[in-house]
Regions:
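N-terminal binding-site loop/beta-alpha segment at the start of enzyme catalytic domains
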Residues: 1-70
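Active-site mouth loops of central-metabolism enzymes
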Residues: 16-27, 76-86, 110
Length: 258
């Protein structure tokens, strides 16, 4: 039986969230985010970088309401030089302003940069956490060693890496997160949905290809929380319904074959 919820930080959320890297600041998108939350969405993932800040602005404008039971995550420090303490500190404050909140539920270091020691970047995020600006901390696109270096500075609630049916380079990271009680958030989770095995299982079950690859991810580990991006309420509802799908072992074997 696939678990339908997961504890992210200190909040129980559904095991399907929503990415927002294409979310522009328009009235239509503000209403879409509100409708998505009303439809049952409990986790929204955004970033300082996305749509030049408009994604964070849209989420902030949409969520001028009680946020109990909802986890909003954002990220900073993506481009070269942005992991430096002064830059990252300013990005955290700007994200707070855009999101129209006093505290960010989950804040990721978006990338580890060779020009700034990982520990220095994480220390800034830890400082913001201690100041009450951030509740929980994450890190993105990292290996197991980098996770442990980050954890030596501040507790890590989530790791966000590229992982999907077609790209499985981070199997060891998923296993490590599962063992350590860290949520693993795969981005671009829908890649691989064009595989013949996916089409066959989707046809037989009367489901969409997207639902099948998301279900495969949910079966991969109880620590997995995918964040497919969408601007469609119908697609969002389909994604949220994925937790109802119980794949059989033969189907998992067919999907897992490379």
């Amino acid at each position: 039986m696939v678990a339908q919820t997961i504890t992210l930080g200190d909040t129980e959320v559904k095991r399907l969230g929503m990415g927002s890297n294409r979310l522009e600041h328009t009235p239509q998108n503000i209403e879409f985010v509100r409708a998505a939350v009303a439809a049952g969405l409990t986790h929204i993932d955004t970033a300082y970088l996305y749509t030049s800040g408009e994604s964070e602005q849209t989420v902030g404008s949409a969520l001028d309401l009680p946020r109990d039971g909802l986890v909003v995550a954002t990220k900073g420090g993506y481009r070269e030089g942005e992991g430096k303490p002064d830059v990252l500190r300013a990005q955290i404050d700007e994200s707070l302003r855009r999101l129209q909140t006093d505290v960010i539920d989950l804040y990721y270091l978006h990338r580890v940069h060779p020009d700034t020691p990982l520990e220095d970047s994480m220390a800034v995020i830890a400082e913001a956490r201690d100041a009450g600006k951030i509740r929980h901390v994450g890190i993105s696109e990292v290996d197991v060693g980098q996770i442990e270096r980050a954890r030596a500075v501040v507790p890590i609630a989530a790791v966000q890496n590229l992982y999907n049916l077609a790209q499985r380079d981070h199997d060891d990271v998923i296993d490590h997160c599962t063992q350590q009680g860290i949520v693993f958030v795969p981005y671009f989770p829908l890649r691989g949905k064009d595989a013949p095995a996916v089409a066959e299982i989707a046809r037989r079950r009367g489901r969409t290809a997207s639902q099948i690859v998301l279900a495969w991810l949910l079966h991969r580990s109880p620590a997995v929380l995918p964040i497919p991006g969408t601007l469609s309420l119908d697609h969002l509802r389909d994604n949220l319904a994925t937790v109802e799908i119980e794949l059989e072992q033969a189907e998992l074997d067919a999907l897992g074959a490379r």
